[in-house]
């Protein structure tokens, strides 16, 4: 697994353009910016764009991503050969190894994107909340995975 390099940006952008229906807002500038910040991984035709939060952020109706939590913003692959799961699990290991990251990974996905939701569930992500975009017009689901130790104590109801 490796971080994307600036020379990868055109290839990555073309991959997103092929999936414009799912990723309508991805621009070349966004990709280039994330590459410069080392928030973009590109390996075996799989792109993962992520961020380690520097402050608490509301990401679901009832869910907040805490400082040092990871948010997986986008994952896209050019093949349906298992490389997506393989690279995603290597990404989980990478986040788990970072001393400055909590080990909690969140992502949100459109509620009607059944293919992506099955993919995340196959990779042991848990549906934890709902969200919406576009002033409530687009419904979404929030998933979470914990890759460091037993963090359940932080998520038990009061």
Language-model regions: role of each:
Residues 95-111:
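Conserved GNAT acetyl-CoA-binding A-motif
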């Amino acid at each position: 697994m490796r971080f994307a390099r600036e020379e990868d940006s055109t290839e990555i952008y073309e991959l997103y353009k092929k999936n414009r229906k799912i990723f309508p807002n991805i621009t070349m500038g966004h990709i280039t910016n994330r590459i410069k910040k080392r928030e973009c991984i590109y390996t075996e035709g799989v792109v993962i764009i992520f961020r380690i939060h520097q402050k608490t952020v509301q990401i679901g109706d009832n869910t907040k991503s805490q400082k040092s939590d990871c948010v997986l913003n986008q994952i896209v692959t050019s093949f349906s050969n298992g490389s997506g799961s393989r690279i995603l699990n290597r990404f989980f290991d990478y986040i788990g190894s970072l001393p400055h990251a909590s080990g909690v990974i969140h992502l949100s996905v459109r509620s009607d994107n059944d293919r992506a939701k099955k993919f995340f569930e196959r990779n042991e992500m848990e549906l934890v909340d709902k969200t919406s975009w576009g002033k409530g017009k687009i419904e979404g689901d929030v998933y979470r995975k914990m890759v460091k130790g037993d963090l359940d104590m932080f998520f038990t109801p009061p």
